[in-house]
């Protein structure tokens, strides 16, 4: 604990700029002394990865559950690109109404029609995509699905309806959101006001 506190309070000054260091420590309690050191380090590192986005926690301990979770996450990451190409992600629309019950539009919800595991809710993959930054690819895909549906509604005379889509804060780091959305508005000839964005934390 002393070491942790000392490192957490460290400050480095470079060219009049002050940087505070935030420490993440992964701990692997050795069960088998014959195990290669490299594997021990991998397990400690795996533990530290679980708290990288948690600024209130600086120490994490490795356990069997972490290994199983890591394997599951890697499987999702490995299957994600092909799932996008095969359009396994499906948009479900949840109606949005006013106080009188009149429909104003809908909220776009994503589900993964997995070829082996069946229909998966967002709880099964969103956190992993957020953690790895891949969420921007899924968001772009969903925006296009929503824009396409708005275009269909317009042709059917239902252009008064809107669709709300999610946008992750991480999207701002990976893509030009303005350019993507303008492109969709032009491609499907829809009103930009009808594609509403809801920022997720």
Residue spans of the language-model regions?
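Alpha-helical scaffold within the catalytic cores of cyclic-nucleotide enzymes
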Residues: 2-15, 42-45, 142-151
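Catalytic strand-loop-helix junctions within cyclic-nucleotide turnover domains
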Residues: 1, 15-18, 22-40, 65-68, ...
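Catalytic core regions of nucleotide second-messenger enzymes
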Residues: 7-23, 52, 118, 154-161, ...
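Catalytic-core segments of nucleotide cyclases and related cyclic-nucleotide turnover enzymes
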Residues: 4, 15, 30-56, 123, ...
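Active-site core of bacterial EAL-family cyclic-dinucleotide phosphodiesterase domains
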Residues: 72-128, 166
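Catalytic core of bacterial c-di-GMP phosphodiesterases, primarily the EAL and HD-GYP domains
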Residues: 29, 98, 102-107, 134-201
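Flexible, glycine/charge-rich interdomain/linker segments that couple
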Residues: 22, 28-31, 50-75, 159-167
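Catalytic/regulatory signature loops of cyclic-dinucleotide turnover enzymes
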Residues: 15, 41-63, 79-90, 116
């Amino acid at each position: 604990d002393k070491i942790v506190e000392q490192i957490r309070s460290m400050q480095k000054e470079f060219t009049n700029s002050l940087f505070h260091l935030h420490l993440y420590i992964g701990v692997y309690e050795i069960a088998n002394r014959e195990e290669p050191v490299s594997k021990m380090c991998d397990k400690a590192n795996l533990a530290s990865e679980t708290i990288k986005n948690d600024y209130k926690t600086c120490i994490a301990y490795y356990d069997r559950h972490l290994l199983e979770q890591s394997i599951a996450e890697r499987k999702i990451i490995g299957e994600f690109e092909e799932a996008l190409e095969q359009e396994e992600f499906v948009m479900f629309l949840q109606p949005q109404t006013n106080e009188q019950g009149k429909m104003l539009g809908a909220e776009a919800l994503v589900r993964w029609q997995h070829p082996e595991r069946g229909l998966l809710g967002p709880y099964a993959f969103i956190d992993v995509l957020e953690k790895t930054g891949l969420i921007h690819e899924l968001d772009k895909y969903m925006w296009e699905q929503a824009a396409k549906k708005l275009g269909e509604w317009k042709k059917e005379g239902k252009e008064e309806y809107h669709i709300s889509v999610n946008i992750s804060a991480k999207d701002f780091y990976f893509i030009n959101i303005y350019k993507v959305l303008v492109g969709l508005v032009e491609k499907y000839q829809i009103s930009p006001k009808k594609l509403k964005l809801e920022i997720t934390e």
